[in-house]
Amino acid sequence: MAINLYKTSIPSTRKGAVDSQVKSNPRNNLIYGQHRCGKGRNARGIITAGHRGGGHKRLYRKIDFRRNDKDISGRIVTIEYDPNRNAYICLIHYGDGEKRYILHPRGAIIGDTIVSGTEVPISMGNALPLTDMPLGTAIHNIEITLEKGGQLARAAGAVSKLIAKEGKSATLRLPSGEVRLISKNCSATVGQVGNVEVNQKSLGRAGSKCWLGKRPVVRGVVMNPVDHPHGGGEGRAPIGRKKPATPWGYPALGRRSRKRNKYSDRFILRRRK
């Protein structure tokens, strides 16, 4: 979808850039309310994830990540906005009367037909196992565990590439640059996730950020020593340390955060960038 630029009529909309209007008219049987509790706090009320709180109420759309309607073709009826993700979603009407939401593939328009199964064409929006795909296919919504549903490459503009198949495994290059092995029996959707221009979006003002449930980000150097290792000092003082630290005293800016000795390390051929 296109990006619309605000006219510079008032300061709050200067340099703002938003998505073109994609209406959302969700079906009642495909949505449900969710209780947003915590707002970044744990059971004792202590902040464990910063910069969270507030935000507009949302209805969760049930997305079909499994695509388990085998060999039943469906038609794209609507392309809708989803407040829970950057990607758009499509309402699919299947031939057996079933109606489901899926992630919007890039380039898909209303009226297109999609299908999932083992012997289906390699065309945009179709879902099939990796073993039936040719090398070099661009894919998204990739399963890690068989029949669990897609878990990889689901963000707006995300795309992975099938680069090798050997034995029982397929080798994928993920959007992060990581190269890893996945079972060839796992399914994926052909194509790239839509709304590629989302990285060009500029909210233009702090209030728009607040609607998303994101609170202001404050530098540690302007805090008190009790709140951050960088805090304290007279005036504009430096951080007073050789290297930056997180609010909890751990090394910041480049420290590996992945847990060591995970079972999935054996499947990662090259770490992400």
UniProtKB/Swiss-Prot annotation:
Swiss-Prot/TrEMBL keywords: Chloroplast, Plastid, Ribonucleoprotein, Ribosomal protein
Q: Name the SMART domains for this protein.
A: Ribosomal_L2 (SM01383), Ribosomal_L2_C (SM01382)
Biased composition annotated in UniProt, kind: Basic and acidic residues: 262-273
One GO cellular component term, please give it.
chloroplast
Give a Pfam family name: Ribosomal_L2
Q: HAMAP family, alphabetically? A: Ribosomal_uL2_B
> What's the protein name?
Large ribosomal subunit protein uL2cz/uL2cy
What is the native source organism of this protein?
Piper cenocladum
- What gene codes for this chain? rpl2-A
